[in-house]
């Protein structure tokens, strides 16, 4: 009887089931999956803030696993990718949530390279194992979102919450129900990761939705008028000329559809242009365009384009204006990797040695105390900022290395944000296209979510004490025979 070679996906799924089951029930035997030449790295940072280095060999991996103190380790697998690699090996990528010793769940990414064991067909061992927590990898990029003047970010969210958020949630839920897992990117996890890059796309959706809401409002006001249709087309033909003034900034974010002309930016400029056409009508019809002029003027004042100090015509309170235009970016310094027990007075005294500190604030990340804090320091001059940047690395209390960076200009943040958003949208389009691999993994590792239980366990068995390892302490798993 000819033995069929199992597919990489079948090998990957069975390995994932065995590996995380052993991690939960008997982590002290986890090293049996590895061999003499295996490498193992587990997410974490040392005292200096650098990522932990890999360990090699089954014995060192055993000590490393014991030092991690795995106890009642529960894992929720969200996605598994498995592909064939060199020398008949299989590379497996796992994404999900991990909770150890009753701690809150944390998103993780783990990659295995499974090498074939020469003595037995369809038998593999872990040659490389790389594990990282997502919040440790992307933690340093989060403060850039807060750099955009926290006050104006909160104001933008308050203005935009009523319209765009339900649309995004409906879109995500529809995509989630259709195919929970795709080949490489899982959309629900992507949206919940709090990454700042997709913001331009939601901004565009927001700007597209607001004129529609305003037009409905105007239609209700114009029902009492004799001819409501001419009032709306009057503004539409005039919008393209204004769009050219923003083309160099927003062309990357505007979709190539008919909704470009109805973006939320130009309408407040179009209303005065359309007035001469409306003035030819009775005076009753001239009122709705004036309402149209007033309403959009409050919202487009907040997008982070153009110089902030020159916008004195925005009807904001004085305290908000003072916070936005008080100090230039060259006087401000971003400080990351702050200890949790630090207070503002201690940090201010530390930076007073470089120059006069006029303002300081510390932000706490809400991840259950797992991540270091970050903050912003404002000097009365740009020279202390440059001295600190030249003097890097900056050591606090003699043992904590602070991550200090100059506050980036608004143009640089927009370029980075928009560039990342375009690439991410392209990836999502490719993943959501027809004929995609949604059916390959959807019925396998996602069974826990649907309540149908894990895959059948009769396919592969764990064999201990043979192969390339160190005698009885080395474990292997084999593919099923068909």
Swiss-Prot record:
| Region Disordered, residue ranges | 140-170, 187-318, 408-482
Q: Does the keyword Transport apply?
A: yes
User: Where is the Glycyl lysine isopeptide (Lys-Gly) (interchain with G-Cter in SUMO2) crosslink found in the sequence?
Assistant: 281
Q: How is its activity regulated?
A: Under physiological conditions, G3BP2 adopts a compact state that is stabilized by intramolecular interactions between the RG-rich and the acidic regions that inhibit phase separation. Upon stress, polysomes disassemble and mRNAs are released in an unfolded protein-free state.
- Domain of life per record: Eukaryota
Q: Which residues carry this modification: Omega-N-methylarginine?
A: 457, 468
One Pfam match: RRM_1
Q: Where is this region: Acidic disordered region?
A: 142-220
Where in the sequence does UniProt note compositional bias of the Polar residues kind? 247-264
Cellular localization per UniProt? Cytoplasm; Cytoplasm, Stress granule
User: Membrane spanning segments where?
Assistant: none
Residues in NTF2 domain copies:
11-133
Q: What is known of its domains?
A: Can mediate both protein-protein and protein-RNA interactions via the NTF2 domain and RNA-binding domain RRM; protein-protein and protein-RNA interactions are essential for undergoing liquid-liquid phase separation (LLPS).
| Subunit structure of this chain's protein | Forms homooligomers. Forms heterodimers with G3BP1. Interacts with NFKBIA (via N-terminus). Interacts (via NTF2 domain) with USP10; inhibiting stress granule formation. Interacts (via NTF2 domain) with CAPRIN1; promoting stress granule formation. Associates (via RG-rich region) with 40S ribosome subunits. Interacts with PABPC1.
Mind telling me what this protein is named?
Answer: Ras GTPase-activating protein-binding protein 2
Q: What is the source species?
A: Mus musculus
The gene that this protein is the product of is G3bp2
């Amino acid at each position: 009887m000819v033995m069929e070679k199992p597919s990489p996906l079948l090998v990957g799924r069975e390995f994932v089931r065995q590996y995380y089951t052993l991690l939960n029930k008997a982590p002290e035997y986890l090293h049996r999956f590895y061999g003499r030449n295996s490498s193992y790295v587990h997410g974490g940072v040392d005292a200096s803030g650098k990522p932990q280095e890999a360990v090699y060999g089954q014995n060192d991996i055993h000590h490393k696993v014991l030092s991690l103190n795995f106890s009642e380790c529960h894992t929720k697998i969200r996605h598994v990718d498995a592909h064939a690699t060199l020398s008949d090996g299989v590379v497996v990528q796992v994404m999900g949530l991990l909770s150890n010793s009753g701690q809150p769940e944390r998103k993780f990414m783990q990659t295995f390279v499974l090498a074939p064991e020469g003595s037995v067909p369809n038998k593999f061992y872990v040659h490389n194992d790389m594990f990282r927590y997502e919040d440790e990898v992307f933690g340093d990029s989060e403060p850039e979102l807060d750099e955009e003047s926290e006050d104006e970010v909160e104001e933008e969210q308050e203005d935009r919450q009523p319209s765009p958020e339900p649309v995004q949630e409906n879109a995500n839920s529809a995509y989630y129900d259709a195919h929970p897992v795709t080949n490489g990117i899982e959309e629900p996890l992507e949206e919940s990761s709090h990454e700042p890059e997709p913001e331009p796309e939601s901004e565009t959706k927001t700007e597209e939705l607001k004129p529609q809401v305003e037009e409905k409002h105007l239609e209700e006001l114009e029902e009492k008028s004799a001819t409501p249709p001419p009032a709306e087309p009057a503004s539409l033909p005039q919008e393209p000329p204004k769009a050219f003034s923003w083309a160099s900034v927003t062309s990357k974010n505007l979709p190539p559809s008919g909704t470009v002309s109805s973006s939320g930016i130009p309408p407040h400029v179009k209303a005065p242009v359309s007035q001469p056409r409306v003035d030819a009508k009775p005076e009753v019809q001239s009122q709705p365009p004036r309402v149209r002029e007033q309403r959009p003027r409050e919202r487009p004042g907040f997008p982070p384009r153009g110089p902030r100090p020159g916008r004195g015509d925005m009807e904001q309170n004085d305290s908000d204006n003072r916070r936005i235009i008080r100090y230039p970016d060259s006087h401000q310094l971003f400080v990351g990797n702050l200890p949790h027990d630090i207070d503002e007075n201690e940090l201010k005294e530390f930076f007073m040695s470089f120059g006069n500190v006029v303002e300081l604030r510390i932000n706490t990340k809400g991840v259950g105390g797992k991540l270091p804090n970050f903050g912003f320091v404002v000097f009365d001059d740009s020279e202390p900022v440059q001295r600190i940047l030249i003097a890097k690395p900056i050591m606090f209390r003699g043992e904590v290395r602070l991550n200090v960076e100059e506050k980036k200009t608004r143009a640089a943040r927009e370029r980075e944000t928009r560039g990342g958003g375009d690439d991410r949208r392209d990836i999502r389009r490719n993943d959501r296209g027809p004929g995609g691999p949604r059916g390959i993994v959807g019925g396998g590792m996602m069974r826990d979510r649907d309540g149908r239980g894990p895959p059948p366990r009769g396919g592969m068995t764990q064999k201990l004490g043979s192969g390339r390892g160190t005698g009885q302490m080395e474990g292997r798993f084999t593919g099923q025979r068909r």
